[in-house]
């Protein structure tokens, strides 16, 4: 669940209203294109729920692969995980067919999360180790 929360949190930051804190570290050949992201409330608040709704288009079927997530608070690494996209932690079952995707998720932002600068990187690869998507994040909480 922690990995899923990190993935959706990073994905949420690709919304156009958050363009100052995220960058696409992928290439034009990436297989997943994000079409819309909505946060409610629009700014995460410690101790409150946040609902993230995200949609996008996957260009081709994915039968396996990995998600590498790294989240840091300052220079301290909080999350450094590499898991199968077909694992039980993933919200989709493999194979993942090409097409449109819409996911909604509500999570609580921990009230004891330290204030400060957080950075993150998510790289998703397919069964051939080809990049599906890559996002870098830089945010202050």
From Swiss-Prot:
Residues 1-19 form the signal peptide. Keywords: Glycoprotein, Lipid transport, Signal, Transport. InterPro entries: GM2-AP_sf (IPR036846), Ig_E-set (IPR014756), ML_dom (IPR003172), NPC2-like (IPR039670). It holds the Pfam family E1_DerP2_DerF2. Glycans are attached at residues 82, 104. Induction: Down-regulated by phagocytic stimuli. GO terms for biological process: sterol transport. GO terms for molecular function: sterol binding. Gene3D superfamilies: Ganglioside GM2 activator. The keyword Glycoprotein applies. Belongs to the NPC2 family. Catalyzes the intermembrane transfer of phosphatidylglycerol and phosphatidylinositol. Monomer. This is Putative phosphatidylglycerol/phosphatidylinositol transfer protein DDB_G0278295. It comes from Dictyostelium discoideum. The lineage of its organism: Eukaryota, Amoebozoa, Evosea, Eumycetozoa, Dictyostelia.
């Amino acid at each position: 669940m922690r990995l899923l929360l990190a993935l959706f949190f990073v994905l949420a930051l690709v919304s156009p209203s958050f363009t100052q804190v995220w960058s696409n570290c992928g290439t034009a050949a990436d297989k997943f294109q994000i079409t819309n992201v909505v946060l409610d409330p629009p700014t995460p608040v410690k101790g409150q729920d946040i609902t993230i709704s995200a949609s996008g288009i996957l260009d081709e079927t994915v039968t396996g692969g990995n998600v590498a997530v790294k989240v840091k608070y300052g220079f301290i690494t909080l999350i450094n995980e590499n898991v199968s996209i077909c694992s039980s932690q993933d919200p989709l079952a493999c194979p993942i067919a090409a097409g449109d995707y819409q996911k909604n998720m509500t999570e609580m932002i921990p009230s004891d999360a330290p204030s400060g600068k957080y950075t993150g990187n998510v790289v998703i690869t397919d069964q051939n180790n080809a990049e599906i998507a890559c996002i870098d994040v830089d945010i202050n909480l």
